[in-house]
Amino acid sequence: MNRSLHLSESFVISCGTVTLDIDRSKVLVIYLRKTGEYFLPKGRKDVGEQLEATAVRETYEETGYIIELLPLQLTTLATLRGNDDIRSAIPGGTTEPVAVTQRTTQGVLKIIFWYVARGDSCAIRQMNTTEQDDENFDAIWCPMDEVVGLLTFHDDKTITARVIEAARGKVPASYSA
């Protein structure tokens, strides 16, 4: 068993989304003009904010699109009340995190909880949201079949591929550990 302890001044919690427009087979990504990087929207949790709310807010602030969490049929270690099988898919889908990533930069641990969301690629993008002004982002709806190749970071590619598989019904209902 690996253990680590991080006190409040040595970690930050962030949340992000893989946002799908299922009807049009598209995924919402961010293009950072100054570096040429493509990545998933994410950002820091505010004090007292729920993780799910952080994911939705940060996606809106960085992209200008209104989204909502999307229940998907995913295998999870989270338990259902009254169900001892912790390696099963949730009937009807779940909005639990699809992944968690961790990285340490300058001694600070960043933990990112990833959620699946739905959005409308034909919706009118809200302009002048907080992050757009400061970060020089473009929001791009990329075809599902092309997005993994477009994304810059390995973790974003892996998470997005898994979400697309789940959205297409290709994730097994259970697995063996």
Give residue spans per PLM region.
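Acidic, metal-coordinating catalytic segment for phosphate/diphosphate chemistry
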Residues: 1-22
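Short connector loops at helix/strand junctions that flank enzyme active sites
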Residues: 12, 33-35, 108-112
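Conserved beta-strand and immediately adjacent loop positions that scaffold enzyme active sites
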Residues: 16, 26, 138
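Conserved Nudix-box catalytic region and its N-terminal flanking loop in Nudix hydrolases
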Residues: 23-81, 177
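NUDIX/MutT-family hydrolases
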Residues: 109-161
